[in-house]
Amino acid sequence: MGAMVPRTLLLLLAAALAPAQTRAGPHSLRYFETVVSRPGLGEPRFISVGYVDNTEFVRFDSDAENPRDEPRVRWMEQEGPEYWERETQIAKGNEQSFRVDLRTLLRYYNQSEGGSHTIQRLSGCDVGSDWRLLRGYEQFAYDGCDYIALNEDLKTWTAADMAALITKHKWEQAGAAERDRAYLEGTCVEWLRRYLELGNATLLHTDSPKAHVTHHPRSKVEVTLRCWALGFYPADITLTWQLNGEELTQDMELVETRPAGDGTFQKWASVVVPLGKEQNYTCHVYHEGLPEPLTLRWEPPPSTDSYMVIVAVLGVLGAVAIIGAVVAFVMMMRRNTGGKGGDYTLTPGSQSSEMSLPDCKA
C-alpha cells in the first residue's frame, strides 16, 4: 500500500493575519476519504469530505459531472480560484493513490477482483485553546475493519493484521510517519486556524443545550431515567447522572453525540433506578454555552387525585359562570319589558306578535 499524496498547502499570508477572536476550544480539522470498487460499473468511486469542528465545509466526489473540491458552507466561498484548483489536484492525486491501493490490498488478502471493496482514511488534528496539537490522526480501514494507524506519539504505526504489517514496514522505510507528523503539527494546525477565521461567525458561536428528563418503566420494580440534551453547539458536552451526589459512571448508558440535522447536536444518558426512588437521582449537563451547569430531576406528572380536584373546581367555576350569565340575561329582559315579565307568556300553539312562521306550501 503506497503512501498517500501529502496535503501540502500554501499558507497565504498566514503570518500576517491578525489573531481572530476564537472560542476557547478545543477545535478540530478532519478529512474523511473513501474509495469503493464496483466491478463492472466503471472506476472506483472516491469521496473526500472535510470537517471543521464537526461542520462539513468541503467535499470532492469523483462521480460528479465535473469532479472538483467544492465549498459546502457559505464562508468557504471567500477562498479564491487558486485555492480550489490546488485542493482539487490534491484530491485527484489521492484518488489515484487509493485506486492503486485497492489493487495492492487485493493481492495482500488474496482476493479476486469480482467483489466490491472499500478503503477508508481519517486524517486531521485536534488543538487546544493555546493552539497546541492535542492529537493527530492518520488511520486507515479496509472493508470496514481497522488496517493501520499512526499512534498518538506520531512516530510509530499499529498494524491490525499480517497484511497491514507489510504496509507498516514499507512506510517505516519511507519515513511516512515523519512526513505525517510534520503535516499534523504544522500545516494542519495553521489551516485549522485559517478556517476558523473565515467561518468565525458560524463556527465560533455557541448554542446552549435544552435539557429534560424522561421516565420509562422497565418492570414492576425498575424504571429508566433518560436525560436529554438537545439543540447545542459545539458538539463537546458532558452528561452525568448522580445518586445523592455520587456519580454513576459505571451504571450509566451514554450514546455518542449525534448531529440534529440543523447544525446543532443532541445526546442522552440514561440510568436504571428503583421505582419510587427517582427523586434521589440528578442529571448534570456541562456545556460551554451554559453560564453554569444544569442540574435536573425527573418531574412526575400531577397525581390523578390532584387532577380530579382541578377538573372539579373548573367544572364548578364553569357552572357558576353559566348561571350568572342566565341570571343577567333574565334581568335584562325584565328591564326591557318594563318589569312585567310575569304577564308575558306563550301558550302552546300561540305565536308572539313579533315573530311568525311562514306558510308551508305544497
Swiss-Prot record:
Region (Alpha-3): 207-298
S-S pairs: C125-C188, C227-C283
Keyword terms of this UniProt record: Disulfide bond, Glycoprotein, Hydroxylation, Immunity, Membrane, MHC I, Phosphoprotein, Signal, Transmembrane, Transmembrane helix, Ubl conjugation
Residue positions, PTM Phosphoserine: S353, S356
Pfam families reported in the protein's UniProt record: C1-set, MHC_I
Signal peptide: 1-24
Chain spans, region Connecting peptide: 299-306
InterPro entries per the UniProt record, alphabetical: Ig-like_dom, Ig-like_dom_sf, Ig-like_fold, Ig/MHC_CS, Ig_C1-set, MHC_class-I_related, MHC_I-like_Ag-recog, MHC_I-like_Ag-recog_sf
Domain Ig-like C1-type: 209-297
Chain ranges on the Extracellular side, renumbered to this chain: 25-306
GO cellular component: external side of plasma membrane; lumenal side of endoplasmic reticulum membrane; MHC class I protein complex; phagocytic vesicle membrane; plasma membrane
The family this protein is said to belong to: Belongs to the MHC class I family.
Protein name (database record): H-2 class I histocompatibility antigen, D-K alpha chain
